[in-house]
């Protein structure tokens, strides 16, 4: 009886893929996000072997404004292909062209977001700060050269992997400008974005905007990375302006004239004179060059803020990469967003979303364009094989209450990638970080990175999770063998594996163990490995000591996160 009630209660969510094409391509693993929009599940792509995130967006046509936002986002993510922007890998084909209500969008999987990284790490280094900002600006350069303004940049909209890779996501509020003149548009989602909104937009719902608004947001995010908390957590518009002027000083009358809201402009005009605060006192121990650039990014007057390309050329990034090699994007054709320039009906939006889905089904798109398509696409249902899987993940979620990490309701979660300094062409991008990657150690050890086992000299050895306190998480541990001396592949850094063996036993031999720590080569922007030795005493001591020892022998270790089921040195 209890089972029967459970099935009735969860019937809508159990039939996760009901009637949709391509469902036999994916194996659902677990629920990783749940919100008003629907569900996000992690899954295995059986065709490629990759782990992906499948976002089910339900009842998308209930409100036309929501449908338009979804259309805008999937269209922009198709047009903006860049390593620093989250990628849509696939959109499932609905069972019927005009009778569908839900869509299933397959994203690359990322581990966390910058909000969680800032929250969980109090030991980020100058190299982390520099590389994080560089990636954000590199993405912004690409976005802005396409004449797109994100308009909702904040730490939760910047996804992160343990190899320090960042990707901008959530383009639902983005806008495309088709002239060089400032564009006036209605600004929604005001409260959620206040802390990262440029001062010229404070208190204004209809606002003119330029690329400078995104630059301000990046400055706020970078400052938050530096100090570990939001820079301007205003409770309302007046408080927001107070916090901004406490740091930057009273703006000039010319800068105040850029503020769109009459009351905000009057408040700033009548404000007592404030001197700028010392950035070196506010951001203790920060690189002086970083603070010089931050002050430019946070210029009160939008005309004084640098473009993303100008910021990339700042001395702060000297030696990191060549700015001229960082890619630009062709401006987006006006016809792609014609629906925003006219009063589109629900049927118009549905047809346009269906056309976007067909972009991921080339043969059907060809038929659609030529007019030879079938009126409806009915697919053989293979829901039964998903029913059990989805029931299980739902049962875990509802039964334990904390079986999965639901605090990050983002559409994209983990994928093992390598940081690239230049953009990857769209046709090559799918080949990055193949899931079949293996390591060769002295020609005798092959470890399957994304699995749960390793074969050492032909003998299986199980990865075990070390016993740790609730306050500390460790890396997956492999039994160390004397022949493990060389690590030849970047893929290992995704797991942050620590090697242990009899040397950890007080009675074992006092020999050094090889340990490979991932780091980012900040001159080239590529992820690399640094091999060194950690003594038995180091390993037996607190892991933070071992981490410090490792850091003193080379570049910074990879970032650590606090995700359930993820084990690493912290």
Swiss-Prot record:
- Which residue ranges does the UniProt annotation give for the motif TXY? 188-190
In this chain, where does the modification Phosphotyrosine occur? 190
Q: How is it modified after translation?
A: Dually phosphorylated on Thr-188 and Tyr-190, which activates the enzyme.
Q: Which InterPro entries does this UniProt record tie to the protein?
A: Kinase-like_dom_sf, MAP_kinase, MAP_kinase_CS, Prot_kinase_dom, Protein_kinase_ATP_BS
| Activity regulation comment | Activated by threonine and tyrosine phosphorylation.
Tell me yes or no: is Nucleus among this UniProt entry's keywords. no
Q: Where does ATP bind?
A: 32-40, 55
Stated EC number for the protein is 2.7.11.24
- SMART domains referenced in this protein's UniProt entry, alphabetically: S_TKc
Keyword entries, A-Z: ATP-binding, Kinase, Nucleotide-binding, Phosphoprotein, Serine/threonine-protein kinase, Transferase
List the CDD domains hit by this protein, alphabetically: STKc_TDY_MAPK
The alphabetized list of GO BP terms reads:
intracellular signal transduction
Indicate the residues that form the catalytic site: 152
**Keyword Nucleotide-binding listed:** yes
Q: Show the GO MF annotations.
A: ATP binding; MAP kinase activity; protein serine kinase activity; protein serine/threonine kinase activity
Q: What is known of its domains?
A: The TXY motif contains the threonine and tyrosine residues whose phosphorylation activates the MAP kinases.
Q: Which family, according to UniProt?
A: Belongs to the protein kinase superfamily. CMGC Ser/Thr protein kinase family. MAP kinase subfamily.
Listed name of the protein: Mitogen-activated protein kinase 11
């Amino acid at each position: 009886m209890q089972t029967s009630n459970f099935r009735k209660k969860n019937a809508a969510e159990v039939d996760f893929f009901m009637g949709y094409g391509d469902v036999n391509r994916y194996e659902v693993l677990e629920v990783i996000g749940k919100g008003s929009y629907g569900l996000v599940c992690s899954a295995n792509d059986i065709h490629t072997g990759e782990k992906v995130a499948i976002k089910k967006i339900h009842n998308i046509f209930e409100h036309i404004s929501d449908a338009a936002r979804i259309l805008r986002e999937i269209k922009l993510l198709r047009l903006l292909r860049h390593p620093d922007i989250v990628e849509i890998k696939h959109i499932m084909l609905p069972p019927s062209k005009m009778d569908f209500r839900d869509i299933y969008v397959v994203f690359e999987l990322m581990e966390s977001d910058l909000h969680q990284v800032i929250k969980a790490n109090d030991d980020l280094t100058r190299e982390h700060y520099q590389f994080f900002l560089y990636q954000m600006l590199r993405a912004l350069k690409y976005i802005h050269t396409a004449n797109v303004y994100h308009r909702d940049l904040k730490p939760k909209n910047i996804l992160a992997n343990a190899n320090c890779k960042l990707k901008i996501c959530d383009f639902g509020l983005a806008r495309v400008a088709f002239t060089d003149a400032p564009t006036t548009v209605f600004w929604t989602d005001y409260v959620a974005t206040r802390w990262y909104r440029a001062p010229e937009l404070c208190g204004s719902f209809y606002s003119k905007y330029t690329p400078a608004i995104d630059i301000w947001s990046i400055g706020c995010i970078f400052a938050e990375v530096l100090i570990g908390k939001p820079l301007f957590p205003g409770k309302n518009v007046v408080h927001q302006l107070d916090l901004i002027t406490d740091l930057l000083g009273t703006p000039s009358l010319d800068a105040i004239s850029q503020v769109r809201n009459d009351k905000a402009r009057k408040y700033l005009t009548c404000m007592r004179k404030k001197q700028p605060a010392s950035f070196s006192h506010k951001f203790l121990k920060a690189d002086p060059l970083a603070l010089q650039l931050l002050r430019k990014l946070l210029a009160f007057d939008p005309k004084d803020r640098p473009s993303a390309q100008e910021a990339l050329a700042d001395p702060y990034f000297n030696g990191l990469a060549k700015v001229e090699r960082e890619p630009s994007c062709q401006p987006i054709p006006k016809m792609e967003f014609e629906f925003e320039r006219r009063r589109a009906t629900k049927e118009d939006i549905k047809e346009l979303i269906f056309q976007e889905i067909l972009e991921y089904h080339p043969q059907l798109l060809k038929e659609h364009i030529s007019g030879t398509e079938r009126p409806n696409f009915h697919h053989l249902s293979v829901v039964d094989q998903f029913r059990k899987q989805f029931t299980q993940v739902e049962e875990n979620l509802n039964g334990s209450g904390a079986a999965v990490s639901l605090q990050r309701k983002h559409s994209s979660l983990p994928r093992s990638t390598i940081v690239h300094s230049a953009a990857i062409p769209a046709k090559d991008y799918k080949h990055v970080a193949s899931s079949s990657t293996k390591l060769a150690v002295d020609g005798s050890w092959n470890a399957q990175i994304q699995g749960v086992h390793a074969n050492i000299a032909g003998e299986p050895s199980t990865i075990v999770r070390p016993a740790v306190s609730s306050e500390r998480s460790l890396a997956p541990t492999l039994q160390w063998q004397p022949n493990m001396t060389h690590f030849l592949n970047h893929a290992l850094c995704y797991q942050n594996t620590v090697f242990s063996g009899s040397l950890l036993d007080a009675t074992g031999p006092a020999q050094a163990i090889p340990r490979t720590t991932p780091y980012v080569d900040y001159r080239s922007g590529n992820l690399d490995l640094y091999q060194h030795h950690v003594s038995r005493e180091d390993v037996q001591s607190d892991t933070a000591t071992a981490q410090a020892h490792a850091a003193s022998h080379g570049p910074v270790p990879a970032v650590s996160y606090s995700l359930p089921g993820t084990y690493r040195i912290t």
